[in-house]
Amino acid sequence: MSKRKRPEELRSHRWLGVSDLRAFGHRARLRQGGFDDADFSGKPVIAIINTWSDINFCHTHLRDRAEDVKRGVMQAGGFPVELPAMSLAEPFVKPSTMLYRNLLAMETEELLRSHPIDGAVLMGGCDKTTPALVMGAISMGLPAIYVPAGPQLRGNWRGQQLGSGSDAWKYWDEKRAGRISDAEWAELEGGIARSFGTCMVMGTAATMMAITEALGMALPGASSIPAADAAHPRMCAAAGRRIVDMVWDDLVPQKLLTPAAFDNVIRVHMAMGGSTNAIIHVVAMARRAGIKLDMNRFDEISQEIPVLANVRPSGQFLMEDFFYAGGSRALMAELSSALNLSCLTVTGKSIGENIAGAEVYKPEVIHPLSDPVSREGATAVLTGNLAPRGCVMKPSAADKRFLRHRGKVIAFDDYNHMAREVERDDLDVTPDHILVLKNGGPKGGPGMPEWGMLPIPKKLLKQGVCDTLRISDARMSGTSYGACILHVAPESFVGGPLAFVRTGDEIELDVPARRIHLHVAEEEIARRRAAWKQPAPRYPRGYGALYLQHIGQADEGCDFDFLAAPGTISEPEIH
């Protein structure tokens, strides 16, 4: 570890430690808040970036947990300041939280840049919050540690364990098919989300919390602690203590984020059976760190690493069970032969040291490499004339008969068109048809909404059909499942081949060969392209207009072009 900083080398010293009029004003304002020299003089100023809000129930507890972080910071001799940031509540933010991920990343970076901050504790968990916080922290380059919100408790309905998201989709289809009543549906509504915390299946929230720990940005085991468990506030206090030492040691993200660390992330993602959304976020995070990472690397590792976590939607159990089985440390220990164990983490130790001694207590929940949940990798990346820059699928959550399939297309121009058609009892559809949704991508959605798990047509549900092949340039919730081809790039809105697919065309999918092909002659595709007109942009002004002008495609991580690479970290002048 490098030589420890002296107090006068702290970034906050420029604001608080010098003898001039500006520093006088800064210190006077701190005294206005009831603080004196013993609170802040010569101490690291630690920002607690808190994404709590009244409408984000994944983060309800973060208001109190921030106090635990402050307790830890003060125990270690730091001065904590809580800075509220945008809270991306997945259920409530429309049209999509993905539209605002980069805005929160920008806010995080600028909060840290514009204030007298020496280090940061990043508090979040709900889906896009985690990558946004990490992306902003990477770009700012200050010591930072991530505090995951943690999963909620198991859902329950009439003695059955429920998984948020996954069972909502399942029982909604049952209701559409007429197999459960309105009264039963109302009971489900009251039992599927029983505590604060993130979705308790292996959705995007659980995936991103776990892989941020695997990246080395969180304390060992932190990502799998349930939000309501007493271990959670203890972890928060420990993170507060640790960030102070990280500041003195100048342990910045750039010292942790190496190509080997990102390979660890992808391996853990595959072993967890993680959300397809993570691919977009990890690519964006890597590029912020100056590491070129593309979807092909995910596919290479997917073919090496099987699924070990028997957690819904790819498995049977829930995140609470995963915690009792040993949690993230146990899974990484089981996977240790495939990990780069020398990678440095926020503890100042290697990931190998962090997972030493971890055990699997419930092998039915965390399987060994010798007996995985699925030998098929968690994610497959496909290319072909329909997706020249790639698309993704989660084979572990799909009906295996669709891994090789050729069928006729039913194409929908937008979400509303699709939503009307799938409810028709007279829709001309069979289980072999392929449903194609256009204009669900980064610009077309806009914000690449989670529309990719298209509803199974009601006509098929009534026949007992549980899965059908669906293709879109949208994303799907990590809690979703089924034979869904996602993230088709380039998207239809910008003239990608998906824009030219028509009802009656045939598409062929071969997941083992990693190919997807539209069986339409090149001449006909060219004719359709010439006749195509781009849809009108949704936003003429404001943040939406900025987003549409600068957003990248799915294979690029959907970052803004002016943020997607590291640059000189500018410091403000103090006048």
Where are these regions (language model features)?
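A short, small-residue-rich loop immediately preceding and capping a beta-strand
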Residues: R113-L133, A144-A149
